[in-house]
A protein has these predicted regions:
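Sequence signature of WD/YWTD-type beta-propeller architectures
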Residues: 1-178
C-alpha cells in the first residue's frame, strides 16, 4: 500500500506520515506541516493533511493525476475533472481559502507543469501547450512530436527552466499491407 513516509537524508529515522491515508499517489508540500495528496480510489480525491493534528480532509473528488507547487507561491495547482469530460486547472491557496479556477485544461488533459517564470504547460497527444499564469491568457502550441509518433503524458521542468522531461508512449505505427 502506497503511503507517505519521512526519512532523514541518510535514510534513518523513518516515520509514517498520516497512517490513515492510503494509497497516496502523488503529494506536494505547502509548508512543513501541510501536505496536499492525490489519493487513489474511485474516484481519486485531493486531500489536505495537517501533520500537527494528524488529520486529513477531502477537498474534492475526481481529480487528475498531476499536482504541483506554483512557483514563487505557497499555492498548489491540480486538475479538476468534470462530468461532461472537460477539466479545469485549479489553484489551492496555500494560506487557506477555497480553490480558484486558473484555466480550462487542454483537451481534457490530466498532466501539467510550471516553469519558473510562471508559464503553465500541458500535453495533448504529441503536442505541448503553454500559457502565462495571468487572467485572460490563452493556450499556445509550443512543440509537436508527431514526427516521432509519441503520445506525451507526464512532464516536468527543471528548477532553472532550461530543460523539460517528458514521459511518452510510442504510438502504434501502421505497417503497409503486403
Amino acid at each position: 500500500m502506497q503511503r507517505l513516509w519521512r526519512f532523514d537524508l541518510d535514510g534513518s529515522n523513518a516515520s509514517l506520515i498520516l497512517p490513515e491515508i492510503a494509497p497516496v499517489g502523488y503529494h506536494k508540500w505547502i509548508n512543513e506541516s501541510t501536505v496536499v495528496m492525490f489519493v487513489l480510489g474511485s474516484p481519486a480525491t485531493l486531500q489536505v493533511g495537517d501533520l500537527e493534528t494528524g488529520q486529513a480532509r477531502i477537498l474534492t473528488e475526481d481529480i487528475g493525476r498531476s499536482i504541483h507547487n506554483i512557483p514563487g507561491t505557497e499555492d498548489i495547482s491540480y486538475v479538476q475533472r468534470h462530468e461532461d469530460g472537460s477539466a479545469t486547472i485549479m489553484r489551492l491557496p496555500g494560506r487557506g481559502g477555497p480553490p480558484e479556477r486558473i484555466s480550462e485544461a487542454v483537451s481534457q488533459g490530466d498532466f501539467h507543469a510550471w516553469t519558473p517564470d510562471h508559464f503553465l504547460l500541458m500535453t495533448d497527444g504529441p503536442l505541448i501547450f503553454a500559457r502565462r499564469y495571468e487572467p485572460g491568457a490563452s493556450w499556445k502550441q509550443i512543440a509537436d512530436f508527431s514526427d516521432l509518433h509519441l503520445n506525451l503524458s507526464r512532464l516536468a521542468v527543471s528548477p532553472d527552466g532550461a530543460q523539460i522531461a517528458l514521459v511518452a508512449e510510442l504510438d502504434a505505427l501502421e505497417l503497409p499491407a503486403n
